[in-house]
Regions:
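Signature for the C-terminal beta-barrel architecture of outer-membrane proteins
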Residues: 1-150, 163-170, 175
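Extracellular/periplasm-exposed beta-strand and loop segments of Gram-negative cell-envelope proteins
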Residues: 153-162
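Non-catalytic interaction/regulatory modules that flank or connect domains
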Residues: 174, 178-182
Length: 182
């Protein structure tokens, strides 16, 4: 079973902050029920054992929308800078938990005037914690009580690269019609 909470705050039309928390609980052989186990996980000390043991992820993110500025930002719809930092299970170890992952990107919703071409460039890193602490391997999307980890049918519930990876992603798309995207 999976429970998630997301809180977004838009202090201005050009700036957004978000917090997300995912909790995996229950499953075969685990007598845990909603909402009790999730409530306990949210108010108790993290990383409890026994019937309170759950698999958790916590993330904080931002999005900065910069409007088009002639000669400086020449894109008709402006551009967006975004980022996310997350932690797996050991979220209480602030300011930078040992099991941290990062994602950062640039999105240009309209590259040329009168065209539907967009561009996204993104970098993600789920290996940062292992590089800081070599004993931490296979941390993201994995958990000892939940042997398949934070996954659905083998695929991580999060970034496609999975655990212990870095990824540079570049994508451009164009709408050929209102419903057909290339």
């Amino acid at each position: 079973k999976l429970f998630g909470v997301r809180l977004s705050y838009l202090p201005a039309s050009w700036l957004e902050f978000g917090l997300t928390r995912l909790t995996q609980f229950g499953g075969r052989g685990r007598d845990q029920s909603f909402p009790g186990v999730v409530f306990d996980a949210y108010i108790s000390e993290p990383n409890q054992t026994g019937n309170r043991d759950v698999n958790e992820q916590a993330m904080a993110d931002f999005r900065l929308r910069i409007p088009s500025i002639p000669y400086l930002i020449p894109f008709p719809a402006g551009l967006q800078l975004y980022g996310e930092a997350g932690t797996e299970d050991k979220w209480s170890q602030l300011p930078v938990p040992s099991r941290t992952a990062f994602l950062g990107g640039l999105y240009i919703p309209q590259v040329f005037q009168g065209d539907t071409l967009d561009l996204r460039i993104e970098y993600a890193d789920t290996d940062y914690g292992r590089r800081r602490h070599p004993e931490l391997r296979q941390v993201w999307y994995n958990n000892s009580p939940y042997t398949s980890g934070m996954r659905y049918r083998g695929f991580p519930l999060g970034h496609h690269m999975g655990t212990d990876g870095t990824d540079l992603f570049v994508r451009t798309t164009r709408y050929l019609t209102d419903t057909l995207q290339l």
